Amino acid sequence: MPKQKTHRASAKRFKRTGSGGLKRFRAFTSHRFHGKTKKQRRHLRKATMVSSGDFKRIKAMLTRLK
């Protein structure tokens, strides 16, 4: 059976944390900031953790991510 490969697009978007979780960056950050409040823009700069519902699916795509 062939080796399972890492999904390269996902590998660029997620990072593994020291405790084994997955860190991701937020959506809605590429343009159209004039419609967002200063508080929204400030919170969009921060990374967040992958939700528990998505964790199993993303972990399967990132088989060899360190």
UniProtKB/Swiss-Prot annotation:
Keyword Ribonucleoprotein: yes
Region span, Disordered: 1-21
Identification of the protein by name: Large ribosomal subunit protein bL35
Compositional bias segments (type: Basic residues): 1-16
HAMAP family: Ribosomal_bL35
Repeat among keywords: no
Gene Ontology molecular function: structural constituent of ribosome
Family note: Belongs to the bacterial ribosomal protein bL35 family.
Keywords of this entry: Ribonucleoprotein, Ribosomal protein
GO biological process: translation
Gene Ontology annotations for the cellular component aspect, listed alphabetically: cytosolic large ribosomal subunit
InterPro entries in the record: Ribosomal_bL35, Ribosomal_bL35-like, Ribosomal_bL35_CS, Ribosomal_bL35_sf
Alphabetical list of Gene3D superfamilies matching this protein: 4.10.410.60
